[in-house]
Curated annotation (Swiss-Prot):
GO molecular function annotations of the record: large ribosomal subunit rRNA binding; structural constituent of ribosome
Family per record: Belongs to the universal ribosomal protein uL14 family.
Record's protein name: Large ribosomal subunit protein uL14
Gene: rplN
Subunit structure comment from the entry: Part of the 50S ribosomal subunit. Forms a cluster with proteins L3 and L19. In the 70S ribosome, L14 and L19 interact and together make contacts with the 16S rRNA in bridges B5 and B8.
A Pfam family recorded for this sequence: Ribosomal_L14
Source species of the chain: Rhodopseudomonas palustris (strain BisB18)
NCBIfam families hit by this protein: rplN_bact (TIGR01067)
Keywords: Ribonucleoprotein, Ribosomal protein, RNA-binding, rRNA-binding
Coiled coil: none
SUPFAM superfamilies found in the cross-reference section: Ribosomal protein L14
GO cellular component, one term: cytosolic large ribosomal subunit
Amino acid sequence: MIQMQTNLDVADNSGARRVMCIKVLGGSKRRYATVGDVIVVSIKEAIPRGKVKKGDVMKAVVVRVRKDIRRADGSVIRFDRNAAVLINNQSEPVGTRIFGPVPRELRAKNHMKIISLAPEVL
């Protein structure tokens, strides 16, 4: 579960390393985001010569959360770190590669480009 002020890793090669959630999109009183949700983030740490720089405000899709993700068949999946992928205003990833596994739940939220770039879908 991601809320305002949550720090996340960046799971793409956009140049950002750490981001902080500054808003959960989807309603004025929406408090938490989970896998597949879109959030607004501020870049807190970035590498030199990346596509983004520190202080930029962008949208991101949450791809991994430490909170248990319960599936319809009763199984549970959980990741070690919270992570997100930066997207532009057209909901396309800023980076060209995705690092680490992503869950199948992204398919239901229509993030097919992220699924196709990911090395492993759990």
